[in-house]
A protein has these predicted regions:
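Catalytic cores of alpha/beta
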Residues: 32-42, 79, 83-102, 114
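Glycine- and Gly-Pro-enriched alpha-helical subdomains that act as flexible
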Residues: 2-4, 15-18
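Active-site mouth loops of central-metabolism enzymes
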Residues: 4, 25-29, 78-83
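Short, hinge-like loop/turn segments at secondary-structure boundaries
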Residues: 17-20, 44-47, 65-66, 118-120
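Glycine-enriched alpha-helix->loop->beta-strand junction motifs that scaffold or abut catalytic
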Residues: 20-24, 41-48, 72-74, 93-100
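C-terminal helical cap(s) of enzyme catalytic domains, especially alpha/beta-barrels
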Residues: 66-70, 93, 108-126
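Short loop-to-alpha-helix "cap/lid" segments that border enzyme active sites
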Residues: 7-15, 31-33, 37-42, 54-74, ...
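Glycine-rich phosphate-binding active-site loops on the catalytic face of alpha/beta enzymes
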Residues: 1-7, 48-57, 97-115
Length: 126
């Protein structure tokens, strides 16, 4: 995970290139349009949008929705933080988000299997 807001562009590009040269993929985490542009300039193949503002720790899924159109479909687009319900995932799917990173909802869950099934939309009757 490479955080675009922390790394300068040259360092970010070197890290992305090193990962690719080693046969690995790197998620470049962003939170703003400027950071998404930086990630695209350095050739990121996976771009994550952190919905949590690390300055005040507020969470807004609209961060992902606002930035989605900046990234072509050939780049994997990941929404990170603040995803708690199946409805959140359905909203993100509707906007062609390729993957989600779920941490807090799973960590707070007492029944992780059930929580994962609910998030995936698996009916208990199936």
């Amino acid at each position: 995970l490479l955080i675009a807001g922390v790394l300068d562009e040259i360092t970010l590009m070197r890290c992305v290139n090193l990962a690719h040269n080693l046969g690995m993929s790197a998620i470049v985490e962003t939170h703003s349009s400027m950071q998404v542009k930086k990630a695209l300039r350095v050739g990121a193949k996976i771009i994550g949008v952190n919905n949590r503002d690390l300055r005040d720790f507020s969470v807004d899924l609209n961060t992902t929705l606002k930035l989605r159109d900046m990234v072509d479909d050939d780049v994997i687009f990941v929404s990170e933080s603040g995803i708690k319900t199946r409805e959140d995932i359905e909203l993100l799917e509707k906007h062609h988000v390729n993957a989600v990173l779920i941490g807090e909802a799973m960590m707070k869950s007492h029944d992780k299997r059930h929580t994962l099934e609910v998030l995936k939309g698996i009916d208990e009757e199936d």
